[in-house]
A protein has these predicted regions:
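Positively charged n-region of N-terminal signal peptides that target proteins for export
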Residues: 1-4
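Bacterial N-terminal signal peptides
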Residues: 6-15
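A generic structural signal for secondary-structure junctions
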Residues: 9, 47, 69-72, 105
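Electrostatic cytochrome c docking/interface patches
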Residues: 17-36, 46-54, 60
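C-type cytochrome heme c attachment motif
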Residues: 33-45, 62-66, 101-105, 123-125, ...
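Axial heme c-ligation environment in periplasmic c-type cytochrome domains
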Residues: 50-55, 76-99, 105-133
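N-terminal, post-signal-peptide region of Sec/Tat-exported proteins
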Residues: 50-76
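Short, solvent-exposed mixed-charge patches
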Residues: 146-147
Length: 147
């Protein structure tokens, strides 16, 4: 199993709670560039008022507005895969910087480890190859739509 994912999950499970004062450590400007290269084919960032902050018009992936600190698999109106719903809605997976990085770099592998289920699947097949890009994308999403 990917050692990065195991390391992240161990740290996440050791943490007692998600702090309200969370932040992102990446470069949001570089994250905007990476988001526009790697994420816009599937995702948008649209406010609750309907203002599009990023992306095109794709709806194959969920709206990523306010993803930082949100429960995984819980955006209203999007049909998530069963494994992600179980991880987030049923087991409380929150998109912290660490969990976001681990997930976007290997969605299926992350869910298999998090759920301890070899049959876990992810609807997201794309993988962000570079950790730095994933960190920067999280910083960008945090900046334009943090709760």
């Amino acid at each position: 199993m990917n050692r990065f994912i195991v390391f992240i999950l161990a740290g996440m499970m050791a943490s007692s709670a998600w702090a309200d004062g969370h932040s992102a450590s990446g470069d949001a400007s570089a994250g905007e560039v990476a988001f526009n290269k790697q994420c816009v084919a599937c995702h948008v960032v649209v406010t609750d008022a309907g203002e599009k902050l990023a992306g095109r018009n794709s709806k194959s992936g969920p709206n990523l507005y306010n993803v930082a600190g949100a429960t995984a698999g819980a955006v209203p109106g999007y049909r998530y895969g069963k494994s992600l719903v179980k991880a987030g809605v049923e087991l409380g997976l929150i998109w912290t910087e660490e969990t976001f990085l681990a997930y976007v770099q290997d969605p299926k592998g992350f869910l298999k480890v998090f759920l301890d289920d070899k049959k876990a699947r992810a609807k997201m097949s794309f993988k962000v190859r570079k950790e730095e890009d994933a960190r920067n994308i999280y910083a960008y999403l945090y900046r334009i739509g943090s709760k």
